[in-house]
């Protein structure tokens, strides 16, 4: 394994300071994250990039699938410190490198050196003001047939206090996300709403009652008691709407 923090690269990138405490509450949602990865897995290659890797919760699940290489990109200084430390602990498991940067700033270097065939954005694209430029950068970094994997929050009418607190720029609809991927030069292979059961609780808590935080205890409870059943139900009947959208698209 090689772990390569690219300190020289980020000097030309605006420094981002974000501890990620609220978002990392989702690190307790193990079943939820495994569900996402299971839906991605049939389309994934072996040379992977995860953008907005945070402190590495989803990255660790990716490594269970023994990829040929994994490149982890995280712009937050605080979160990157934890991510890089964890990556060093994964030394015997895979070829892992880290970048403390936004993806467009390292896209060319990562494309040339790491030759990724799959680039993953889990709960990241909604934070990026110019998401269309981001998708174009991903498209340029991938070879023909390379794929982008996107998981984002759905429906602007669910946008509430938590979204504002964690700096979500937007929530998406499937047609909107599909159109943006198509405009960037991708062909959509899979696009589904995800977690139908989470829609009503989310609306009540964050829109109606105006809460702005996510409690780890409730995340664990939902993950253990609800997610396994919702996962089975949505495998049988694709939901007409959901709290999130999962999309896979291929560079044509």
Model regions and ranges:
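Conserved N-terminal segment of class I S-adenosyl-L-methionine
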Residues: 1-122, 133-135, 240-245
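A C-terminal cap/extension of S-adenosyl-L-methionine-dependent methyltransferases
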Residues: 6, 12, 27, 109-112, ...
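Short, glycine-/aromatic-enriched active-site segment of Class I SAM-dependent methyltransferases
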Residues: 21, 148-170, 174-182, 204
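Feature marks short, surface-exposed loop/turn motifs that line or immediately flank catalytic pockets
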Residues: 57, 79, 156-158, 197
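Residues lining the SAM
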Residues: 122-125, 151
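A short glycine-rich, Lys/Arg-flanked "PGG" loop and its adjoining helix->strand segment in the class I
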Residues: 132-147
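Conserved S-adenosyl-L-methionine
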Residues: 186-197
